[in-house]
């Protein structure tokens, strides 16, 4: 392969990769039913927290701080699920002091952009799902 042909080929590959990355960045979030806690977890949380909510999702290795094991929330809180605090955290109203700056996306903003009147139902459904998977 000549140097010119190789250069053209490399430029085309680079352009295709850049276009694909831009398309991925602009891909809309999957919509879920407001009452579907497991579906919301799968669509919005599992990439980092993992399908089993153990903090081992495929994106976890790319993060500077390891995602929490969400099956142990109650265990870390004296055996009681802190529902109000979890709901405020999901909605982006509170931060977890141990995390320092907030790395987790604030889903309340996403939920409000979908249908403002369903935010409380969405937050409750996701909180109920997290409560249901406690060990």
What are these regions (language model features)?
Residues 35-43, 116-117, 134-135:
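Sequence context surrounding c-type heme c attachment/ligation sites in exported
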Residues 1-4:
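Positively charged n-region of N-terminal signal peptides that target proteins for export
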Residues 37, 41-51, 104, 126, ...:
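The canonical Cys-X-X-Cys-His
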Residues 53-87, 109-116:
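Gly/Gly-Pro-rich "capping" loops immediately C-terminal to redox-active cysteine motifs
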Residues 7-16:
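Bacterial N-terminal signal peptides
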Residues 20-40, 78:
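Electrostatic cytochrome c docking/interface patches
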Residues 68, 89-121:
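Axial heme c-ligation environment in periplasmic c-type cytochrome domains
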Residues 42, 46, 75, 91-95, ...:
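Sec-exported extracytoplasmic/periplasmic mature domains
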């Amino acid at each position: 392969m000549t140097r010119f042909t190789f250069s053209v080929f490399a430029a085309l590959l680079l352009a295709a990769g850049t276009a694909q990355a831009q398309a991925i960045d602009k891909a809309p979030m999957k919509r879920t039913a407001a009452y579907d806690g497991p579906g919301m977890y799968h669509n919005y949380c599992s990439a980092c927290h993992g399908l089993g909510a153990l903090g081992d999702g495929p994106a976890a290795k790319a993060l500077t701080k390891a995602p929490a094991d969400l099956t142990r929330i109650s265990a870390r809180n004296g055996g009681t699920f802190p529902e109000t605090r979890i709901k405020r955290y999901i909605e982006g109203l509170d931060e977890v002091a141990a995390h320092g700056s907030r790395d987790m996306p604030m889903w309340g903003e996403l939920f409000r952009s979908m249908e403002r009147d369903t935010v409380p139902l969405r937050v409750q459904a996701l909180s109920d799902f997290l409560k249901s998977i406690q060990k």
